[in-house]
Swiss-Prot record:
EC assignment: 6.3.2.8
UniProt cross-references to InterPro entries, sorted A to Z: Mur-like_cat_sf (IPR036565), Mur_ligase_C (IPR004101), Mur_ligase_C_dom_sf (IPR036615), Mur_ligase_cen (IPR013221), Mur_ligase_N (IPR000713), MurCDEF_pg_biosynth (IPR050061), UDP-N-AcMur_Ala_ligase_MurC (IPR005758)
Lineage: Bacteria, Pseudomonadati, Pseudomonadota, Gammaproteobacteria, Legionellales
Name of the protein this chain belongs to: UDP-N-acetylmuramate--L-alanine ligase
Pathway given in the UniProt record: Cell wall biogenesis; peptidoglycan biosynthesis
Any one Gene Ontology cellular component term annotated for this protein: cytoplasm
Cellular location(s): Cytoplasm
Provenance organism: Coxiella burnetii (strain RSA 493 / Nine Mile phase I)
């Protein structure tokens, strides 16, 4: 559907408390639209939007939608949702979240960041760089930036930076001027009928929708992207640790939770020395993608380097929450949103490099029964890399339980040695008591997952710390 700004004054957002829809609602509000919305319960996102003027009700009975010019919904909204059904009955135009986003991006020079892992941090880092360089961008990312405490911004500049979502294939609504893909992995396969090749072909279609004179930026360390790169008709810029990448990371080292490295590129005679206030080789890759894009738009180099050095990160991405007080010392609490085996692996590697002598306690809440089923072997392998595992029950994210894909099924797949250093906690509210009993002074406790595991942070840090 084509968005006609002349007649769209009132937008209703279903599931307005979700990070993606809330970010879109914030942009619409700041562009002068009347925004109404609904969700099942209030959260930080709805509170932020209400302060900006959004009118929100906390039910889905279908009564709030009938006066809107159009309605926006995400893939989390099911076909039987009363508001969705009411909108159809009232013949109110319905747009998917990604469709509305793509319509808004048409007004700008657009940059879309896609990938299975790292797209939120990369798009957030890129947005921060554009702000620091006084390019006054509009942006919409999939997480709350720690410095601005918002996932969205409306600027007066020419650029719109957005996270592109492959989980529901809605990135196909986009036709960006610059497209970035950080990696491709076997996730959200239910959208693609379980066919990884179809997922790969959809990425190719997305990249080929980049403007004819546009640029595609790909991580050459990813074997699928390496395979795809020569197939594309657009100009391709590559980055990575790989020796044949155009933007190449060299001399990477981690000092505590900071990263230092150099970037060799065809744009420069001398390597670019980069410092990040965040750990992990994956973040060095994210910063290198940002550097490649900065060169495309001819960003001021000192502004770029400053922005990379002072980028404070995105909420729930290796976020240090505080300390839990124990009888004989403290344990450090870190929260990370990663919910795929490769993301967990990157988090553990960064934590090990930062605190090599300290015991790692991983508290993992699996996200979706389908993902747990599809990646069971990979989860078992990566979870074995921690010193002690506290396993929570699967966060369903609206899915019905799948036999053999719950927390106990994961434990049954583990080796005897790993099972002996695993504690299963079926109820999240019992986690603080469990951690008090098993934690040791100087432990690093990582709360890992995309579900509601973060809701327990306050209890851990304030009640026990």
């Amino acid at each position: 559907m084509q968005l006609d700004k002349k007649i769209i004054n009132h937008v209703h957002c279903l599931g307005i408390g979700g990070i993606g829809v809330s970010a879109l609602a914030e942009i619409l509000l700041k562009k002068g639209c009347r925004v109404t919305g609904s969700d099942v319960s209030p959260n930080k996102n709805t509170e932020r939007l209400q302060r900006l003027g959004a009118e929100i009700i906390f039910n889905h009975d279908g009564t709030a939608i009938t006066q809107a010019d159009c309605a926006v919904y995400s893939s989390a909204i099911g076909a039987t949702n009363p508001e969705l059904m009411a909108a159809k009955q009232a013949k109110i135009p319905l747009l998917k979240r990604g469709e509305m986003l793509a319509n808004l991006m048409k007004e700008y020079q657009s940059i879309a960041v896609a990938g299975a892992h790292g797209k939120t941090t990369t798009s957030g880092m890129l947005s921060h760089a554009f702000v620091e360089a006084n390019l006054d961008p509009t942006f919409m990312v999939g997480g709350v930036l720690n410095n601005s405490q918002t996932p969205a911004r409306v600027g007066n500049g020419h650029y719109f930076i957005a996270e592109a979502d492959e989980s529901d294939a809605s990135f196909l609504f986009m036709h960006p001027d610059i497209a970035v893909v950080t990696n491709i992995d076997a996730d959200h396969l239910s959208t693609y009928d379980g066919d990884f090749n179809r997922l790969k072909q959809t990425y190719i279609q997305f990249l080929e929708q980049t403007a004819q004179d546009g640029v595609v930026v790909l991580c050459l360390d990813d074997p699928i992207l390496r395979e795809i790169a020569p197939l594309l008709s657009r100009r391709v810029i590559t980055y990575g640790f790989s020796s044949d990448a155009q933007y190449r990371v060299v001399d990477y080292c981690q000092q505590g939770i900071q990263s230092l490295f150099q970037i060799h590129s065809p744009q420069r005679k001398a390597p670019l020395t980069v410092k990040l206030s965040m750990p992990g080789q994956h973040n060095a890759l994210n910063a290198t993608a940002v550097t490649a894009i900065a060169d495309v738009v001819q960003m001021n180099e000192p502004a770029l380097l400053k922005s990379l050095a002072d980028f404070p990160g995105v909420d729930r991405r290796f976020t240090i929450r505080g300390e839990m007080i124990l009888p004989k010392g403290n344990a450090l609490i870190i929260e990370d949103y990663g919910h795929h085996p490769n993301e967990i692996k990157a988090t553990l590697a960064a934590a090990r490099a930062a605190w090599p002598e300290r015991r790692m306690v991983l508290v993992f809440q699996p996200h979706r029964y389908s993902r747990t089923r599809d990646l069971m072997t990979e989860f078992v392998s990566v979870l074995a890399e921690t010193d002690w595992l506290v396993l929570l029950e699967v966060y369903s994210a609206g899915e019905m339980p799948i036999p053999g894909a719950d927390g106990m099924a994961l434990i049954k797949m583990m080796s005897n040695g790993m099972a002996q250093k695993t504690t299963f906690v079926p109820l999240l509210q019992n986690l603080p008591e469990t951690l008090q009993k098993l934690s040791q002074p100087n432990d690093i406790i990582i709360l890992q997952g995309a579900g509601n595991i973060g809701s327990i942070v306050t209890a851990l840090v304030q009640t026990h710390g």
